[in-house]
Amino acid sequence: LSVFIFIFVAQTASAGVANLLESESEIKGSFLFQKGIFTHHWNDRFNNDTDLYSLEYYSDNDWLYGIARFQNSFYQPSWYVYTGKEYPLKEFFKLQFKGKITAGIMHGYDDEDGKYNTIITRFKTFPIIIPSLKIVYKRFEFDIVALAHEGFMFTTGLRF
């Protein structure tokens, strides 16, 4: 599946290379491909190499829909399927600052027969809300994502 997503993104992105530096940064009916570039947990026993990839679709009615694949805090492959919305906060020079909130279903947390005794690993699949702050420059995006009370993550992305 990761190969399919990569090929899809590469083909779609190559078709729009000439438009990468357009001044319009909020493109309706567009996709955003993101990669997690840094993760930090307050507890060192948790995974800080999440290998996150996500693909989001931004509709004409300001809603976003997405899917993300990553290695969770317990080094297990996981998925997040979600919807959400962005909220403009401030524009400073050519940078746009936005708030973003997503809500969806996360799957892949397993307690491995009691090895990880947390509420989320007992359910394996659970609803979740994730807030983030975003900096946008033209079609390039950078997010700071809150990981509940466990830490934070930085992602970077390209809108096409």
Predicted feature locations:
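Outer-membrane beta-barrel translocator/channel fold
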Residues: 46, 97-128
